[in-house]
Amino acid sequence: MPINIVDSIGSVDDAIEKNEEIIEKIKAYGNKLFSTVDTSQCIDANTLISFEKGIEIGSANYYDKEIENSTPYIRVGNLLNNNYDTYCIDNDYKKCDYNDILIAFDGAPGRNSIGLCGVYSSGIYKVICDSKLKGFVYFYINSDLLQDIIKQNSQGTTILHASKSIKLFKMPSVNNIILNNQLNDLYNVLINLYKKQISLKKIKQLLLNKYFD
């Protein structure tokens, strides 16, 4: 049993845990900052943001591990842990980059994430907005203001659907430049931390593969 691999896996696990703690603290701070935004006069959110729905490629096109020329296929479950467990061959499907905001309206309405790169499924929408508003929009999406609207308009028994709630979204005006810049800075830090997290998980998997060879 190569003890150096075991030690390395433990060290990577520690780094993943520490990184996750930092992510949660930054998200909490960003949410606290956003809670200071004046919500007494909200505007139609659809004037500032839009949503691009992903595509279902079919399970016949899934790969359970990364192969040559493949790209991650992101499903609703991946938004929870920011991990990749399914891959596909890129055939000009709907794509997202690390700095895109992804949100689910089917299955787990309101669940969202950033820091993922690949092809995204039909249960997920990519948020389209001005890059200067990414931080504001991200923390708006995670606020009670929006999550409550999604929750109240989720329909279905076995699988919840909430895409019809999009037209009801109300968003505070972006009139505090300093606050907007602060939220954008936090957003960019989160993107880098999530990218680091994915890299650490890949390293861990490589070490595990080496250990079990």
Cite the ranges covered by each PLM segment.
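Glycine-rich catalytic cores of cysteine/serine-nucleophile enzymes that process amide/ester linkages
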Residues: 70
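His/acidic/aromatic-lined binding-pocket segments of jelly-roll/cupin-type domains
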Residues: 93-94, 101-103, 169, 183-190
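A short beta-sheet element
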Residues: 92-146, 151-156, 160-165
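Glycine/Thr-rich phosphate-binding loops of Rossmann-like dinucleotide-binding domains
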Residues: 83-84, 112
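A short glycine-rich beta-alpha junction/loop motif
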Residues: 1-6, 119-125, 155-179, 185
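Short alpha-helix capping/helix-loop boundary micro-motifs
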Residues: 85-92
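Non-catalytic DNA-recognition/assembly elements of restriction-modification systems
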Residues: 1-59, 73-81, 173-213
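Short coil/turn segments at secondary-structure boundaries
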Residues: 58-67, 151-154
